[in-house]
Amino acid sequence: MDNTSKINKITKIEVQKRNKKRVNLYINDEYAMAFSTELAFKHNLKIGQEVDYKELKVIAEEDNYIKCKGDALKFIEKSYKTERQVYDKLLSKGYDNKTIERVIDFLTEYKFIDDWRFGELYIEERLKREGRNKIKYSLMQKGISESIIDEKLNCVDRDKEKDALNKIAEKKYKSILKNEEDKTKIYNKLGRFLMSKGYLWEDVKSVLNKLLYSDG
């Protein structure tokens, strides 16, 4: 018989043994679904109560949202994450797009995720050891939009950026000198290293000339 045409009554609401925050619902003496105790109270579900499957579908969607939100909050609790990172994580756990988007809206509204802030903090921390090209690539891989990245990078103090480059270059230069004396080889080796760190060529060229060919 079609479930939508017969009377469906709740015959049992059972708290799960392994998770006291969830209950099992039985309809007409058959297991129907499981959901949070929060929803059982919210919908005032009782034994003997008649229910229709439209109502159960609503409860199932709400329960899925609650679980999805819980997984999202757990994912971001130890470190700041981008919207893309959260989305991909939830998608990998099997949640549907509609539920994920709803959770993303919640996280964004309450500032649990903020791509602008993430970009700012990431750039500030990475500038100590990487150039803007590598930083930009990494942020794009994390799902930050190029417009946000460019705006944040344009606010970077160029003197601080060059100071960081100089320190890294000097340290690597001293290391290379232990095994190499030819200036051309040092120039090429050090140049490749600094470029791999994501620094701009004009900055790299300047520091190479300073280290290798400056009289001072």
Curated annotation (Swiss-Prot):
Query: What is a biological process (GO) this protein takes part in?
Result: regulation of DNA repair
Which family does the record claim for this protein?
Belongs to the RecX family.
| Gene3D superfamilies registered for this protein in UniProt | Winged helix-like DNA-binding domain superfamily/Winged helix DNA-binding domain
Q: What protein name applies here?
A: Regulatory protein RecX
Q: Which Pfam families match?
A: RecX_HTH1, RecX_HTH2, RecX_HTH3
Where this protein primarily resides, as one coarse class?
cytoplasm
Q: Does the keyword Hydrolase apply?
A: no
Q: What does this protein do?
A: Modulates RecA activity.
Q: Which domain of life is it from?
A: Bacteria
Keyword list (alphabetical) reads: Cytoplasm
Q: Looking at the keywords, is Aminoacyl-tRNA synthetase present? A: no
Q: Name one GO cellular component term.
A: cytoplasm
What subcellular compartments does it reside in?
A: Cytoplasm
